[in-house]
């Protein structure tokens, strides 16, 4: 259950990172944060990759690790305002919502699912 929650949270976090320009989201990012779930929380480290899949949309894939395991998620995000993205991610049978906000060379990601939430800070 922690694995599914962690993956969902990570994917959502990645999806909600805003960028000044859509093209700047493309590429590899890495960082850390906290995954919260019923009964506790874990520190998490992630590597996230964004690739363009349309005029404005980006595919998202992430590989994250906690003390209890490694998790992978995939999804898609689209612009939802200035330096903001929104999308859905999936992993370990769980789907989550992601909001990404960009401030310079840093992405702030929030992920939420029925199993928990996550907050991440990513950089290039």
Task: Describe the function of each predicted region.
Residues 12-20:
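C-terminal segment of classical bacterial N-terminal signal peptides
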Residues 23-124:
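Central antiparallel beta-sheet cores of small beta-barrel/beta-sandwich binding domains
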Residues 1-4:
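Positively charged n-region of N-terminal signal peptides that target proteins for export
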């Amino acid at each position: 259950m922690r694995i599914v929650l962690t993956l969902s949270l990570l994917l959502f976090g990645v999806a909600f990172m805003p960028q000044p320009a859509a093209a700047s989201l493309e590429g590899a990012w890495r960082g850390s944060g906290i995954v919260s779930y019923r009964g506790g929380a874990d520190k998490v480290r992630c590597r996230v990759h964004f690739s363009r899949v349309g005029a404005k949309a980006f595919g998202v894939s992430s590989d994250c690790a906690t003390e209890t395991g490694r998790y992978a998620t995939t999804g898609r995000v689209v612009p939802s305002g200035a330096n903001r993205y929104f999308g859905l991610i999936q992993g370990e049978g769980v789907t989550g919502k992601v909001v990404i906000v960009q401030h310079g060379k840093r992405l702030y990601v929030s992920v939420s699912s029925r199993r928990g939430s996550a907050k991440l800070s990513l950089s290039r």
